[in-house]
Swiss-Prot record:
Residues annotated to bind heme b 1: 103, 205
High-level lineage: Bacteria, Bacillati, Cyanobacteriota, Cyanophyceae, Synechococcales
Family: Belongs to the cytochrome b family. PetB subfamily.
Native source organism of the sequence: Synechococcus sp. (strain CC9605)
Protein's cellular compartments: Cellular thylakoid membrane
Residues that coordinate or bind heme b 2: 89, 190
Cofactor(s), names only, from the UniProt record: heme b; heme c
Further remark: Heme 1 (or BH or b566) is high-potential and absorbs at about 566 nm, and heme 2 (or BL or b562) is low-potential and absorbs at about 562 nm.
Keywords annotated in UniProt: Electron transport, Heme, Iron, Membrane, Metal-binding, Photosynthesis, Thylakoid, Transmembrane, Transmembrane helix, Transport
UniProt entry tagged with the keyword Iron: yes
Cofactor detail note: Binds 2 heme b groups non-covalently with two histidine residues as axial ligands.
Name of encoding gene: petB
Function: Component of the cytochrome b6-f complex, which mediates electron transfer between photosystem II (PSII) and photosystem I (PSI), cyclic electron flow around PSI, and state transitions.
Molecular function via GO: electron transporter, transferring electrons within cytochrome b6/f complex of photosystem II activity; metal ion binding; oxidoreductase activity
Name of this chain's protein: Cytochrome b6
Length: 218
């Protein structure tokens, strides 16, 4: 590379970063690809916004039944731009779900789930389930009337499953009733377990797309 900087030369000598850049930049893009093939990328951008704004809110949120609502209220009224951070988090959550739905429809209608891309489809559907679960767990965190009763209803749904239903309800709630243990579990799922799960499946999803390329036209 002509007129390269010493910093570039240092990294190039050790990591051969130019080869990596050439490989990324030279990936073939089929001529049939249009704006609707960007829906998956937009979903990723929404997730990154969710991660950044969610991380910012953890500095102020208190996951206890006594202080959760007050901490959210404090974030919205007293923290500089706290209202904006939480609002962006909510808006990007809605946008992420919408883009995900449109992305799934695009892939299905263009046959992107067919052989040899079955595993790519499976990882995508798994991410869709995790994304919906994000919404369910996040909805409860303010611990207001809406959040409380939403958790009570959602966590009671598995009771209809034969044999293991009652066990699953107690596992979700952390006991026989909805309370502090429930909020702690939902907070842990929303801020730690699900982000890591989604990140792992995203990596698998992108690596398979990178390996197999974009599916052809119908």
């Amino acid at each position: 590379m002509a007129n390269s900087s010493p910093v570039y030369d240092w990294f190039q000598e050790r990591l051969e970063i130019q080869d990596i850049a050439d490989d990324i930049g030279s990936k073939y893009v089929p001529p049939h690809v249009n704006i609707f093939y960007c829906l998956g990328g937009i979903t990723l951008v929404c997730f990154l916004i969710q991660f950044a704004t969610g991380f910012a809110m953890t500095f102020y949120y208190k996951p206890t039944v006594a202080e959760a609502y007050k901490s959210v209220e404090y974030l919205m009224t007293d923290v500089s731009f706290g209202w904006l951070i939480r609002s962006v988090h909510r808006w990007s959550a809605s946008m992420m779900v919408l883009m995900l739905i449109l992305h799934v429809f695009r892939v299905y209608l263009t046959g992107g789930f067919k052989r040899p891309r079955e595993l790519t489809w499976v990882t995508g559907v798994t991410m869709a389930v995790i994304t919906v679960s994000f919404g369910v767990t996040g909805y409860s965190l303010p611990w207001d009337q809406v959040g409380y009763w939403a958790v009570k209803i959602v966590s009671g749904v598995p009771a209809a499953i034969p044999v293991v239903g009652d066990f699953m309800v107690e596992l979700l709630r952390g006991g026989e009733s909805v309370g502090q243990a429930t909020l702690t579990r939902f907070y842990s799922l929303h801020t730690f377990v699900m982000p890591w799960l989604l990140a792992v499946f995203m990596l698998m999803h992108f690596l398979m797309i990178r390996k197999q390329g974009i599916s052809g036209p119908l």
